[in-house]
Amino acid sequence: MLHEPHASSTQETQLLYGHCAEVLGTDGLWLNVRGPDGYEGWMHDGYTAPSELDKFIKWAWDIESEISMGCSVRDSRGATLDLPLGAVIGDGHVIAGRALDMAHRRATFPPTADAIVASTTALFQGTYYQWGGITPWGADCSGMLQSIFALHGIHLLRDAWQQATQGAAVDCSLEDARPADLLFFSDREDGHITHVAMAIGGSQAVHIALGRGGHCLESFSQPDDYTRALAGRFRFARRIVA
């Protein structure tokens, strides 16, 4: 999903294979769409296929059928598709990698703090920073956390400043935050939230950051120059998982 209806526009977020969106308007072959999280942007018609209204699913992560954990599928036409974490398998047949239906996703990825921390540190390890990305193929800070929490059955909004309105306020320092608490940062004078990380315990956090090139673990008890600067921008924490 792009900011404006042309190919050189900035990517705002992503809609994955099999996910639904509402069409708000058109500009030639470009569609102005609203995703399941309320985010709006532009997509070219070539990336879309019509869907019956009664089949519209607000959150594709909640469907009963299989979702990719990172796999390759062969579709009904015999074409091979590589699908990232979160894409819907649909009528495809998995030929490599893994896909899980709802029952197996809920059993494998429960909505608990320890499980969420494990997924965030493992599934996005090695991911590079990509503005607007939401998958291990490239993600930004809030995109990674939105996808991870969705995998565990918890819906977060898209941007860091929006996620900062969710859950419960927590009065704690960076060192005292509990595993899976969201940590919010700002580099603006008005305090507007511009970055989010997740506490993993032991005075550590995991995030995707441009300054690190992507996925990274930070230690606030043994900081380097980057981590000290990051800590200076800390504003508050929110607890999503009780």
Labelled PLM ranges:
Residues H6, T13, Y17-E22, D27-L29, ...:
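Boundary regions of SH3-family modules and the immediately adjacent low-complexity/disordered segments
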Residues L2-E4, R74, S186:
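Core beta-strand residues in small-molecule sensory/regulatory alpha/beta domains
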